[in-house]
Amino acid sequence: MISIDSTAMKTNSFDLANLSQDDTALEIRNLDLRYGDKQALFNVSMKIPKKQVTAFIGPSGCGKSTLLRCINRMNDLVDNCHIDGEILLHGQNIYDKRIDVAALRRNVGMVFQRPNPFPKSIYENVVYGLRLQGINNRRELDEAAERSLRGAAIWDEVKDRLHDNAFGLSGGQQQRLVIARAIAIEPEVLLLDEPTSALDPISTLTIEELITELKTKYTVVIVTHNMQQAARVSDQTAFMYMGELVEYADTNTIFTTPKKRKTEDYITGRYG
């Protein structure tokens, strides 16, 4: 049996089935995904609220990371990947052939399981995306670097060593640096694929506190194997199993009164 501290859960919730367009950051409609002959996602539909934290949970291989990577088209990089259905951002299907994928990925940032700083200084890591956009004004870059490092709760730790190599940071610091790099280009949506799985408990707590702060400016979607983490940081939780979205509701409901037997079995540790 897995113990979840219900006192740590968020209490605000939306009617997810009837979420208004103004409150919706992303809408996924009838999404199927295949890798060659193997189907990995089956008819997934959901609305993700703006400026909230939405968690995807489920056993290994259930499709949660695959679904996350659909949101900024990272699966385009996988051979023989075929997608049917729609993901709407501002009412436009991101899989429309007219979509600028590079612009989409600027608007929908992503942070992976293991910290992946570039072999550059701390400063150059943060402003890398801005330089790619042609921004080279020093004052503008300096302001963006400080704003982003503060936003990632790491400014006070690195402000006197901005020109040191990023590889000299601890794992937890590197992950916050990567988050700073992602938010420097001011995306609307931030995708986090198991962002603390490679970190120690103290660094994990720091990242969790940061996630709660990030939602004041960004829509955050997180994949996690850690159900206690999902309960602590998310407002909504989606439970996936074998490529299907089994249940999607406010986090308190998922962890205390799930409506589906599969969800209850997973939450209570009967499988997973």
From Swiss-Prot:
Instruction: Report the domain of life of the source organism.
Output: Bacteria
What is the annotated signal peptide range for this record?
none
Compartments, as annotated in UniProt: Cell inner membrane
Q: Which reaction does it catalyse?
A: phosphate(out) + ATP + H2O = ADP + 2 phosphate(in) + H(+)
Q: Which Pfam families match?
A: ABC_tran
**CDD domains, alphabetically?**
ABC_PstB_phosphate_transporter
Q: Name one GO cellular component term.
A: plasma membrane
Q: GO molecular function, one example? A: ATPase-coupled phosphate ion transmembrane transporter activity
Residues the record lists as binding ATP = 58-65
The biological process GO terms on file are: phosphate ion transmembrane transport
Major location (coarse) = membrane
State its Enzyme Commission number(s): 7.3.2.1
| Membrane topology type | Peripheral membrane protein
Q: Where does the record place the ABC transporter domain?
A: 26-267
Q: Which SMART domains does the record match to this protein?
A: AAA
Key words of the record: ATP-binding, Cell inner membrane, Cell membrane, Membrane, Nucleotide-binding, Phosphate transport, Translocase, Transport
Q: What does this protein do?
A: Part of the ABC transporter complex PstSACB involved in phosphate import. Responsible for energy coupling to the transport system.
| Oligomer status and interactors | The complex is composed of two ATP-binding proteins (PstB), two transmembrane proteins (PstC and PstA) and a solute-binding protein (PstS).
Q: Which family does it belong to?
A: Belongs to the ABC transporter superfamily. Phosphate importer (TC 3.A.1.7) family.
Record's protein name? Phosphate import ATP-binding protein PstB 1
What species was this sequence derived from? Shewanella oneidensis (strain ATCC 700550 / JCM 31522 / CIP 106686 / LMG 19005 / NCIMB 14063 / MR-1)
